[in-house]
């Protein structure tokens, strides 16, 4: 049996479990802060600006260093980078748990982001080394994808349960035993792999430019979404795009490039990257609305709403299994197309939500979306990894993760901004006429502001304001669902037109082993 078609055994699947666990935690640490903020705010008393940095420091540094860490793993060894990052992540988590000031918590969250940036590209690249059979690798990547997505879902649940019995720092301590397990089992189960010809030296300037580009663009998107178009957001976006252009120019010119620009010349690499960003754009962007619907319209607690979101996670293995089983028979492009169309059907279901719709309507529609996206994400990531040479798998996986980060940031910014504009426009014409200017401004700002304002009004006026706010919010939710459906259908059409497998590749129906790939 050739090495390319060698099937994985118990050792490889156990190694996959070891790889998935830290990624679950890295994803959890992004979402767990939503339920932790009230408790730590009382204890540490951060300012408004400090509170934002407590939330953002982790995600910003993680996104900004993905490309650097993926390339570093290709050069010095993926297992080495992973285990070093795991040790640093555990140490930073310990410091965060006992942070005694907002500044200390911000610093430790930043350290966690730096360490967390080693996890995704290293684990994905190691999956490429562990699984050589196409179908098994697609399944393994799907399990990894479900773990990463599932961490964001279970984070608020785990956080809520811990905070009922322990102090806020306990949400960070759960990272330590998992990282310790990785440090113990990783050397035994995970193979080491590095580029045999990494070049003479590491491109430090390129790493700095990539960091500035990603951080500045994401910060500019976030600032523009929160405060509207202004000098800070526009300046940050301009600086990020300039740094990005300089980074790409340097990658073409230097012999020690972090990424091989010629990868982008093949449709089997650039189209899946775009699909990854589009799917994340829609799913992450729409999450702004489904959480508000559960907590503000239906009146659920954060823990209860997180529990109701579990079906969207539990259905992911089904989507992954279906995608992995269908890909060898009908081809990866058709599986991705079908997954996007299934997700679009779920978004269409979300356009039918009304203020009096129950939780089952929302959960069923979101579960359909999750079913489709799970299969797409697994196959898309596998296609991206397969399009790159094995010695560049770390850089390829980091680009896949970076595209997803950008997609999520853009989804929140663009869908959030459009939704806010729709909500304010409708509230401006439908809010009760007897509100004071201050009350009207609060009610027009957000749904939460309208609900808080309603608590200060007489019963009749409060009911009228709540109804107007609910109607305005449902309208913005429906528009976000329509846009998400259009994007996913557009992605399906793009795949159908651009990714046409060669008829001779009946076993894989994906990118050919060498044709169209960039040289090492």
Protein language model features and the residues they cover:
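Transmembrane alpha-helical cores of Major Facilitator Superfamily
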Residues: 24, 56-60, 87, 142-150, ...
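Interfacial helix-cap and linker-helix signal at transmembrane-aqueous boundaries
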Residues: 40-41, 72-73, 158-166, 221, ...
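Transmembrane core module of solute transporters
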Residues: 16-61, 167, 232-235, 243, ...
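Hydrophobic transmembrane-helix bundles of small-molecule transporters
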Residues: 142, 164-282, 289, 300-302, ...
């Amino acid at each position: 049996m050739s090495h390319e078609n060698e099937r994985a055994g118990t050792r490889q699947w156990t190694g996959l479990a070891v790889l998935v666990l830290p990624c679950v935690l890295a994803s959890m640490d992004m979402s767990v802060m939503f339920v932790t903020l009230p408790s730590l705010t009382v204890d540490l008393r951060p300012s408004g600006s400090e509170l934002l940095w407590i939330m953002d420091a982790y995600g910003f540094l993680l996104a900004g260093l993905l490309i650097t860490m993926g390339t570093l793993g290709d050069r010095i060894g993926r297992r080495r980078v992973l285990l070093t990052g795991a040790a640093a992540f555990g140490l930073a988590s310990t410091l965060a748990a006992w942070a005694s000031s907002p500044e200390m918590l911000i610093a430790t969250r930043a350290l966690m982001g730096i360490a967390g940036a080693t996890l995704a590209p290293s684990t994905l690249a190691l999956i490429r080394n562990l699984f050589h059979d196409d179908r098994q690798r697609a399944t393994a990547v799907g399990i990894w994808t479900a773990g990463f997505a599932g961490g964001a879902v279970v984070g608020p649940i785990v956080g809520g349960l811990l905070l009922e019995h322990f102090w806020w720092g306990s949400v960070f301590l759960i990272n330590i035993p998992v990282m310790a397990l990785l440090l113990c089992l990783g050397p035994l189960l995970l193979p080491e792999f590095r580029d045999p010809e990494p070049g003479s030296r590491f491109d430090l300037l390129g790493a700095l430019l990539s960091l500035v580009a990603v951080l500045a663009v994401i910060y500019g998107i976030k600032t523009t979404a929160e405060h509207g178009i202004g000098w800070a957001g526009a300046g940050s976006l301009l600086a990020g795009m300039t740094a990005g252009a300089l980074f790409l120019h340097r990658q073409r010119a230097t012999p020690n490039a972090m990424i091989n620009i010629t990868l982008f010349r093949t449709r089997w690499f650039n189209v899946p990257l775009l699909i990854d960003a589009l799917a994340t754009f829609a799913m992450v962007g729409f999450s702004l609305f489904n959480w508000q619907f559960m907590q503000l319209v239906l009146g659920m607690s954060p823990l209860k709403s997180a529990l109701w979101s579990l079906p969207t996670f539990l259905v992911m293995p089904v989507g992954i299994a279906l995608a992995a089983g269908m890909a060898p028979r009908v081809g990866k492009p058709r599986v991705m197309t079908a997954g996007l169309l299934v997700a679009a059907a779920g978004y269409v279901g979300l356009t039918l939500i009304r203020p009096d719709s129950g939780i089952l309507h929302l959960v069923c529609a979101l579960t359909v979306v999750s079913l489709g996206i799970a299969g797409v994400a697994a196959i898309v990531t596998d296609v991206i990894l397969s399009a790159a040479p094995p010695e560049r798998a770390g850089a390829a996986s980091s680009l896949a993760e970076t595209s997803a980060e950008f997609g999520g940031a853009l989804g929140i910014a663009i869908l959030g901004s459009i939704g806010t504009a729709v909500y304010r426009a409708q509230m401006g014409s439908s809010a009760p006429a007897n509100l004071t200017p201050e009350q009207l401004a609060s009610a027009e700002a957000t749904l939460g502001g309208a609900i808080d304002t309603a608590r200060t009004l007489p019963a009749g006026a409060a009911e009228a304001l709540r109804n107007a706010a609910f109607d305005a919010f449902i309208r913005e939710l429906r528009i976000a669902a329509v846009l998400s459906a259009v994007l996913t259908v557009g992605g399906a059409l793009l795949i159908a037109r651009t990714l046409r497998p060669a008829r001779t590749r009946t076993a894989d129906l994906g990118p050919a082993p060498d044709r169209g790939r960039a040289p090492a």
